[in-house]
Amino acid sequence: MLRSCDIDAIQKAYQSIIWKHEQDVKISSTFPNSAIFCQKRFIILTPELGFTHAYCRHVKPLYLFCDRQRHVKSKIAICDPLNCALSKLKFTAIIEKNTEVQYQKHLELQTSFYRNPMFLQIEKFIQDFQRWICGDFENTNKKERIKLEPFQKSILIHIIFFISVTKLPTLANHVLDYLKYKFDIEFINESSVNILKQKASVFLVPRRHGKTWFMIPVICFLLKNLEGISIGYVAHQKHVSHFVMKDVEFKCRRFFPQKNITCQDNVITIEHETIKSTALFASCYNTHSIRGQSFNLLIVDESHFIKKDAFSTILGFLPQSSTKIIFISSTNSGNHSTSFLTKLSNSPFEMLTVVSYVCEDHVHILNDRGNATTCACYRLHKPKFISINADVKKTADLFLEGAFKHEIMGGSLCNVVNDTLITEQGLIEFDLFRYSTISKQIIPFLGKELYIYIDPAYTINRRASGTGVAAIGTYGDQYIIYGMEHYFLESLLSNSDASIAECASHMILAVLELHPFFTELKIIIEGNSNQSSAVKIACILKQTISVIRYKHITFFHTLDQSQIAQPFYLLGREKRLAVEYFISNFNSGYIKASQELISFTIKITYDPIEYVIEQIKNLHQININEHVTYNAKKQTCSDDLLISIIMAIYMCHEGKQTSFKEI
C-alpha cells in the first residue's frame, strides 16, 4: 500500500511529466474590440491593447507595462474607484469581421513562446538560480540569502543572454525582453544588449572575490535545466580543474538527487529524457581533450596563466557561432606576461570588464599618498571577508614592493609619465600676452557666443575639490578666457545648488556687463556627481540671467534613462581628447586670457591667471594598460578650475549645436 505522502509525490511527478511543455500563460485572451480610425499601414497589434496606432510604440511606459504584465502570473490589483471609472468607458466596436481572427492568430503566436520547450528550460534555470540565492538548496534550518557582486551578476547575464539567443534564434526578441524583465535591466539600450550577446567576454577581478566559486553553481544549474548543453571548463592547473569538477559533481548530487549523474574521464553527465547534458573539465596542460568538441559555453579560469599553446586551442572556438567563451582572471599587473588581456581595452568590441578598487583617474593616489587604499570617487561594495586598510598595504609592500597595488588592489599597469606636457614658452606667453576684450578695434572680430562650463562640487573640504566655472569665447582660431571661478561651499547647511548657481551667475552677468556684444550663452553643467542638482542649477541660472540680461540662453542636454533630454552633461572618455586638444592649442599659443577677466572667488591679491597656471603645471600623463589618461591633482592642489577651462574650450571646439536647447 502507498502512504498518502507517497501518493501526493507520485501525483505531483506525474502531473509535471504531463504538463512539462505547457504553461499557464496570463496573456489576456479577451479581444479588445475597440475601433481605430487611421490608415492600415499605421495600425499595430498588441495582445493587451488590441489594434492601436503605431505611435503608441513610442509611449514607453505603456508598452513597458504591457511587457511586464505579460510575464507576471498574478493579476494586477486595481482600486475600486479606478475600476468603476474604467468600466464606464465605452469604445466604438470594430465593423470588420476578420479582425478578431487576426487578433487570435497574433495571440496564439505570443503564447506559443511561453510554451516553447527551450524557453521553459531557460525559465527553470532562472528559477533554480533564484532559489539558490535564497538558500533553498541548503539543508540547514537557517536559510541565508547569498549576495552576489555586480561582476557575478554580469557574468550570469552574459551567459544566459547568449545561450538564449543561440537556442531560440527565431524568438530572440521575445526571450530578450523576458530576460531584461527578469533581471530588472529594462533600462539598457540595444547596444548594451549586443554586448551581452557577444561571443567572447573577459572579466578581470581582484583576488578572493569568488570568481571560481560562482562558476560552480552556474555549471550545475545549466546541466540540470538545459537539455543537451555542452560546457567546457579550462583551468591553469590540473588540480584546480579537478577540484572544480568534484565540487560540481558533489553539488549536483546534493541539489538534484533524483537526476542520473555520472562522472567519468573528467566529464560530468546529467541524463535527460532524450539527450544528455555534459561538462568537460581540462587543464591548460591537456587541451587535446577540448579539441573537436562543440561547446555552448567555454569557461577559461585564470586566463592570464594559461599556456600560450593552450590559448591558441581555446581561440579556435571563436569562429563557432554557438559558443560563448568567458575569460576570467585576476587583475595581476606586476608582469606584462600575466596581464596581456588588458590589451583588449582597445578592442572595437566592448568585451573587457575590469573590476578595480581604484579608477584610472585616481590610480596615482596609491603612490602619492602613503595610506591611500581606496578611490576618492568610488563607493566600494566589497565582500565581508575582504578587509583593506593601511596596515594591509604596509604589510604587503614589506613582503614584496608594489604587491599591494599590483596583486591586491587589482591595479592596472600604471606609469606616470614625467615628460613635459606644457612648454615653458607656452606658460610665459599665456601669462604675459593678454587681449583687451573691451577695445573697440578687437570687438568686431570676437565670437558672439559665450561658452560656460560648470563642474559642481558639493563639499566644504578645500583639500578635496571645489566647483570650477569657466567662460570661454573665440577670436578667430584662438580661445579667450573671459571668466573663471573656483568656488567652495561655506557650509554644508547651505543650499549647495543655489550657492553654486549664484556664484556662476555673478560671473556671467559681470562678463556680459563688460562685453555686451555676446548674443548667445551656451551653458554646460556637468552632472556626473548629481544629475538632479545639475538640473536645479540650470533652472536657477536661466531665471537669474534672463531677468537681468535678455540673452538667448541654451543648455547642453543629455538623454536620461527615460530617454528624456535633461540640462546636464556627463563627462566620459572624451576627457582625454579634451586634454590633448587643450595641450596642443596651449603650446601653440592659441589660448589667451582677457585683460578684463572676471573672478570673484580667487583672492584679490592673487592673479587668477597665476592661480590657474599652478594647476596647468601639475598636468601629467598616466599610462594604464596602454590606455592614456591625464591628471593635474596634487596633495595640496586640485584641478577643478583647469578641467572646467579644458572642457569649455573642447565644447566650444566641438560645437554640438543640436545638443544645446532652451529650458
From Swiss-Prot:
Motif Walker B motif in this chain: 297-302
Protein location: Host nucleus
First-listed, main subcellular location of the protein, grouped into a coarse class: host cell
Active-site positions on this chain: E302 (for atpase activity), D455 (for nuclease activity), E526 (for nuclease activity), D640 (for nuclease activity)
Family (UniProt): Belongs to the herpesviridae TRM3 protein family.
InterPro entries reported in the protein's UniProt record: DNA_pack_C, DNA_pack_C_sf, DNA_pack_N, HSV_TRM3, P-loop_NTPase
EC number assigned by the record: 3.1.-.-
Subunit structure: Interacts with the terminase subunits TRM1 and TRM2. Interacts with portal protein.
Gene Ontology terms: cellular component: host cell nucleus
GO terms, molecular function: DNA binding; hydrolase activity
GO biological process, one term: chromosome organization
Placement of sequence motif Walker A motif: 205-212
Function statement: Component of the molecular motor that translocates viral genomic DNA in empty capsid during DNA packaging. Forms a tripartite terminase complex together with TRM1 and TRM2 in the host cytoplasm. Once the complex reaches the host nucleus, it interacts with the capsid portal vertex. This portal forms a ring in which genomic DNA is translocated into the capsid. TRM3 carries an RNase H-like nuclease activity that plays an important role for the cleavage of concatemeric viral DNA into unit length genomes.
Keyword annotations: DNA-binding, Host nucleus, Hydrolase, Viral genome packaging, Viral release from host cell
Name the UniProt record assigns to this protein: Tripartite terminase subunit 3
